[in-house]
Amino acid sequence: MSDEQSSWRSKLLLICQQTRSSSESIHFAALKDHHARLQACESMEKAMKERCQKKITMSRRTKRGITHAGYLFEMPHNSVFEPECRGFYESCQQTEMASSDLQAPALEVSSTYPVQQAVKSRPEGQFPESRNNSTKKIDAQQYSSESSSQSGFGFRTAREQLIMDELKKKNRQATSEVDAVPTGMMNFRKKTLGGKRTVSSNFVSPVAQNDNSTSSRSSSIPPALAHLDSKMVDHILGESMHDFKPVAWEDIAGLESAKSTFLEAIIMPLRRPDLFTGVRCPPRGVLLFGPPGTGKTLIAKSIASQAKAKFFSINPSSLTSKWVGDAEKLVKTLFAVAAAHQPAIIFIDEVDSLLSKRSANENESTLRLKNEFLIHLDGAASNEEIRVLVIGATNRPQELDEAVRRRFVRRLYVPLPTREARQKIIEKLIHQVKHNLDVRQVIELAELTDGYSGADVDTLCRYASMAPLRSLTPDQMEVIETHQLPAVTMDDFKQALRVISKSVSSEDCKQFEAWNEIYGVRH
């Protein structure tokens, strides 16, 4: 047996081995294709031998001086020398097929055989039509039907490459879709897990990719954020960006001096940035500190409502990740998203837990997160064109890092509500329920709640308003109407005062006042 016959026999054995677990139709088609290639190779060899014999005969006659005046050599048809290529069987080059090539997944060899780039992206036989009427159009459907009859081991033949090049020239606007091939091409490869990789193999993700969801998600992202990770942008928009009910200044009792400062330094610059430029550039970092429950978060929402700005509420969990380096990227994405939706307000509640004092024993990832936040916070304050305000709220200003304290230019103290402020809070809350309190009793309640924070007064009023419901039995509560409920009385509030106590001590207030004397803004 010659070497060529041994080679063809080895190919036949490899095909039988790879298709033994496939259906009978696929197995029969593979054997039939192999036989056709063998016949084409034998016919080509026969033609080559005949041509060589004619050349030898002509050379001998020339040497003997025998010529034929009317002899005209006719070039055989190209199909004699170049039979239609069927994948990896190119008889003219005598290329051998190795077992590793049969084991490699067909879709992974994208750089060598780019015809498989978009096998699943287009139905069979649908190619973009050419708009150039001056050139000859190629019937894509006919090409699809011809290609579907080929065996197609995932390779691109010279004829296929020529047709693809012509389609690309005629369809400049659809070059991304031209690489698609008909799905009808037969693929005899047996799918394996962890097949042998070759030099030309590309990485294939083990997770199936959904192109439709990715494109729809990326289309909702503004063009200014196209350079960022779409997943991080969605995370910031989903976790931090909130739509809340607008809060007016009248909803905040007291703090008249602080309101004037907010209006001058924050609200008007955000609404009229053309007036506040150069030296008049407003501060972009504001720190609200004071006892808990004094309305620091409510003030931030009111500022966002008055300035007609987007409100981003940040907590430490929104900027942390188990992957190294992702926390810094989330901080960068946060400021980029806020700049894209300007005017915007980034509110960081309990900022001391995120930007506390740095130490040598601190975790490296936490330290990098703080440094990245400080860099962007300083950048937001130095760029006059970006209307992004960063508001931090804390009840432990002593724990803040010195660099953070410097970047929060305006440090405003939010104290406990005064007697007039507590009176307004009580009047606003009891107005929602049926009561029989007069102005004198409301003033008395405001004096009895000295040292209470705004949250404490709110809790007191809610507890007192539940007294009429507590006086009812379960059976009465089932049948009673809303207008039949008893009114809230002064005795109900006195009972609530015995249950609800203040949550802020006088020592805590002295510490806040001392820190305000050193670092705070004096109204």
UniProtKB/Swiss-Prot annotation:
<dbReference type="GO" id="GO:0000287">
    <property type="term" value="F:magnesium ion binding"/>
</dbReference>
<dbReference type="GO" id="GO:0016887">
    <property type="term" value="F:ATP hydrolysis activity"/>
</dbReference>
<dbReference type="GO" id="GO:0008568">
    <property type="term" value="F:microtubule severing ATPase activity"/>
</dbReference>
<dbReference type="GO" id="GO:0005524">
    <property type="term" value="F:ATP binding"/>
</dbReference>
<feature type="binding site">
    <location>
        <begin position="293"/>
        <end position="298"/>
    </location>
    <ligand>
        <name>ATP</name>
    </ligand>
</feature>
<dbReference type="InterPro" id="IPR003593">
    <property type="entry name" value="AAA+_ATPase"/>
</dbReference>
<dbReference type="InterPro" id="IPR027417">
    <property type="entry name" value="P-loop_NTPase"/>
</dbReference>
<feature type="compositionally biased region" description="Low complexity">
    <location>
        <begin position="141"/>
        <end position="151"/>
    </location>
</feature>
<keyword id="KW-0067">ATP-binding</keyword>
<dbReference type="InterPro" id="IPR041569">
    <property type="entry name" value="AAA_lid_3"/>
</dbReference>
<dbReference type="InterPro" id="IPR015415">
    <property type="entry name" value="Spast_Vps4_C"/>
</dbReference>
<dbReference type="GO" id="GO:0051013">
    <property type="term" value="P:microtubule severing"/>
</dbReference>
<protein>
    <recommendedName>
        <fullName>Fidgetin-like protein 1</fullName>
        <ecNumber>3.6.4.-</ecNumber>
    </recommendedName>
</protein>
<keyword id="KW-0378">Hydrolase</keyword>
<dbReference type="GO" id="GO:0016787">
    <property type="term" value="F:hydrolase activity"/>
</dbReference>
<dbReference type="GO" id="GO:0046034">
    <property type="term" value="P:ATP metabolic process"/>
</dbReference>
<dbReference type="Pfam" id="PF17862">
    <property type="entry name" value="AAA_lid_3"/>
</dbReference>
<comment type="similarity">
    <text>Belongs to the AAA ATPase family.</text>
</comment>
<keyword id="KW-0460">Magnesium</keyword>
<dbReference type="Pfam" id="PF00004">
    <property type="entry name" value="AAA"/>
</dbReference>
<dbReference type="GO" id="GO:0031114">
    <property type="term" value="P:regulation of microtubule depolymerization"/>
</dbReference>
<dbReference type="GO" id="GO:0005813">
    <property type="term" value="C:centrosome"/>
</dbReference>
<feature type="binding site">
    <location>
        <position position="253"/>
    </location>
    <ligand>
        <name>ATP</name>
    </ligand>
</feature>
<dbReference type="InterPro" id="IPR003960">
    <property type="entry name" value="ATPase_AAA_CS"/>
</dbReference>
<keyword id="KW-0547">Nucleotide-binding</keyword>
<keyword id="KW-0479">Metal-binding</keyword>
<comment type="subunit">
    <text>Hexamer.</text>
</comment>
<feature type="region of interest" description="Disordered">
    <location>
        <begin position="114"/>
        <end position="154"/>
    </location>
</feature>
<dbReference type="InterPro" id="IPR003959">
    <property type="entry name" value="ATPase_AAA_core"/>
</dbReference>
<dbReference type="GO" id="GO:0000070">
    <property type="term" value="P:mitotic sister chromatid segregation"/>
</dbReference>
<dbReference type="Pfam" id="PF09336">
    <property type="entry name" value="Vps4_C"/>
</dbReference>
<dbReference type="InterPro" id="IPR050304">
    <property type="entry name" value="MT-severing_AAA_ATPase"/>
</dbReference>
<dbReference type="GO" id="GO:0009611">
    <property type="term" value="P:response to wounding"/>
</dbReference>
<dbReference type="GO" id="GO:0005694">
    <property type="term" value="C:chromosome"/>
</dbReference>
